[in-house]
Regions:
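Short, surface-exposed beta-strand-loop junctions and turns on beta-sheet-rich folds
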Residues: 57-59, 78
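Short beta-strand segments
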Residues: 21-54, 69-73, 83-84
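Short secondary-structure boundary segments
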Residues: 54, 75-76, 129-130
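A generic secondary-structure signal marking the coil-to-beta-strand transition
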Residues: 14, 22, 47, 81, ...
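Short beta->alpha linker loops
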Residues: 54-55, 95
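Charged, gly/pro-rich active-site loop segments
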Residues: 1-9, 79-136
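Short, basic/aromatic recognition patches
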Residues: 2-24
Length: 136
């Protein structure tokens, strides 16, 4: 086991896990305070994490109301190694769906997601870390 790391930046070994086509779990906060979890695709932009989603989905509405979020990524082949990224989010429109196209390539090799259509109101969630926990 490589060890444990905690800071506000993503270490190289954790970046390699994020850059791989591993699914992630996004945690947001429901209006009543309960956690809401979603399986997502993501990519890195420096130490920020980018997630494509759709305007009007529960996770998007939760983040517009309360921008705090956590993402957990672990490899299917070794779930005792993981990176947890806690922070705050911003949301920007992605009218051309550029991020979902990149993520579809990364995760499936296809040009677009199975349920993605050109008129889907896509947004990009940018998670800026306040704390990164890496156990490798």
């Amino acid at each position: 086991m490589a060890g444990y790391h905690s800071s506000a930046t993503i270490p190289d070994a954790a970046a390699a896990l994020i850059d791989a086509p591993e699914f992630a779990t996004l945690a947001t906060v429901e209006p009543g305070g309960q956690p809401q979890l979603s399986v997502v695709w993501l990519e890195r932009d420096g130490d920020d994490v980018l997630i494509s989603t759709v305007r009007g989905r529960r996770k998007t509405d939760n983040l517009l109301r309360d921008p705090r979020a956590t993402v957990l990524i672990y490899p299917a082949s070794g779930p005792y190694s993981y990176v947890e990224i806690r922070g705050t989010t911003t949301i920007a429109d992605d009218p051309g769906g550029s991020l979902i196209h990149k993520l579809a390539q990364k995760y499936t090799g296809a040009e677009r997601g199975e349920h993605d259509t050109p008129d889907t109101p896509r947004v990009i969630v940018r998670l800026t870390p306040s704390k990164v926990i890496w156990k490798g």
